[in-house]
Amino acid sequence: MARIAGVDLPKKKRVEYALTYIYGIGLKSSREILEAVGISFDKRVHELSEDEVSSIAKKIQQSYLVEGDLRKKVQMDIKSLMDLGNYRGIRHRKGLPVRGQTTKNNARTRKGKKKTVGSK
């Protein structure tokens, strides 16, 4: 089993799809990586040699922000929005939808379980 960026890639999958198991790499990025390294898209992970795995890992390390570093960057970006106190930061702080969705009826995922107000 190939291990790249701390992620075990599934053996039987094609390399272009297996690379998408790494947080921060989608299908387009994985194809760009394989093209740059010169590996066929049709190759399966268990068919890769150690040299090919190391060249893929090297390309990812020097060109992409993945896994823990990317998660940390996203968290820091959200934290900076909240510290600035702008509209998006306030929405993040309150746990409401950030991108303009209305909250009159839905937004249950973001707002959580409904809090009922007791009546007499």
Curated annotation (Swiss-Prot):
- Residue ranges under compositional bias (Basic residues)? 107-120
Q: Which residues cross the membrane?
A: none
Q: Name one GO cellular component term.
A: small ribosomal subunit
Q: Per the record, which residues fall in region Disordered?
A: 93-120
Q: Which UniProt keywords apply?
A: Ribonucleoprotein, Ribosomal protein, RNA-binding, rRNA-binding, tRNA-binding
Q: How does it assemble?
A: Part of the 30S ribosomal subunit. Forms a loose heterodimer with protein S19. Forms two bridges to the 50S subunit in the 70S ribosome.
Q: What is this protein called?
A: Small ribosomal subunit protein uS13
Q: What organism is recorded for this protein?
A: Helicobacter pylori (strain G27)
Gene giving rise to this polypeptide: rpsM
